[in-house]
Design a protein with these regions (language model features):
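C-terminal motif of bacterial Sec signal peptides marking the signal peptidase cleavage site
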Residues: 17-20
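Gly/Gly-Pro-rich "capping" loops immediately C-terminal to redox-active cysteine motifs
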Residues: 40, 44, 56, 60-86, ...
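Flexible coil segments in periplasmic/lumen-exposed cytochrome c-class electron-transfer proteins
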Residues: 24-33, 37-41, 45-48, 95-161, ...
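Disulfide-rich extracellular modules and peptides
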Residues: 23, 53-56, 69, 115, ...
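Short alpha-helix boundary/capping elements
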Residues: 89-90, 121, 193
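Bacterial N-terminal signal peptides that target proteins for export
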Residues: 1-11
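Disulfide-stabilized extracellular ectodomain repeats and their linkers
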Residues: 48-51, 64, 91, 151, ...
Length: 242
């Protein structure tokens, strides 16, 4: 009887030990492996890691333009968005994310981000009949005429010289203009910043939306206010030794 109990106990112990050897020694269990960064194809982690810091966790509320704005997505098609994500915007805070441009994202990952942004936040038909200005400028702008356009459409919020007003922030600030490309300025003029209370091209003057050329001209005026070396408020005399 004791021998039988001994054999049963030994058999149970053997089964327990063998069950822990179902995989080769040192090999991680299935499902426990850490996913390589270039294999992540879920929008959530890709957006959180690469986009949310500037554009906001839910596509709005960040320092950069809201991606969850249907008007913006109505003027910037997938091709334009993908180009910006992949190649960035030189001279601004928007970096290139494609591996062939020095970034960390694969072509598939960029596809996931651009496709999902449009799928989640666009609203098909939102600009039907609106005749919005084109996403990219069709011709050169006239800065002198742009100053007139600014006075008509922008001054009431941003102040006479663009240094801030009762409703809007400074948009001729040296550092601001240094961080914004002409295309970014154009996009904001057209799409607005609804999360900040800034209207799109239709809302500055009721019943009188901005024309394509007026948008182009006011961007030319803003661009003409850029300075070569922003962020250097001290004159050379400050550094003269006495």
């Amino acid at each position: 009887m004791n021998r039988f109990r001994y054999l049963c106990s030994f058999a149970a112990l053997a089964v327990t030990l063998l069950s822990g050897c179902s995989s080769p020694h040192g090999q991680p269990q299935k499902g426990s492996e850490t996913q390589a960064p270039n294999e992540v194809l879920q929008f959530g982690p890709l957006y959180a890691q690469n986009c949310a810091g500037c554009h906001g966790a839910e596509g709005q509320g960040g320092a950069a333009i809201a991606l969850a704005d249907p008007v913006y997505l109505g003027i910037a098609d997938e091709k334009a968005m993908r180009k910006v994500i992949a190649g960035g915007v030189h001279g601004t805070s928007m970096p290139a994310f494609a591996q062939n441009s020095g970034g960390m994202l694969t072509e598939k990952q960029i596809d996931v981000i651009s496709n999902e942004i449009l799928s989640r936040w666009s609203r098909p038909g939102i600009l039907n009949g609106a005749n919005p200005p084109s996403y990219a400028a069709k011709s050169a702008g006239n800065a002198q005429q742009g100053e007139v356009v600014y006075g008509n459409y922008c001054k009431s919020c941003h102040g006479a010289d663009g240094q801030g007003g009762p409703k809007g922030s400074a948009i001729t600030n040296d550092s601001f203009l240094a961080l914004m490309s002409d295309q970014e300025l154009r996009t904001i003029v057209i799409a607005g910043r609804p999360e900040l209370g800034a209207p799109d091209w239709r809302g500055n003057v009721p019943g009188k939306p901005m024309s394509d050329q007026e948008v182009t001209d006011v961007v030319a005026w803003l661009a003409s206010r850029r300075v070569p070396n922003p962020g250097q408020p001290y004159s050379a005399s400050t550094f003269v030794q006495h």
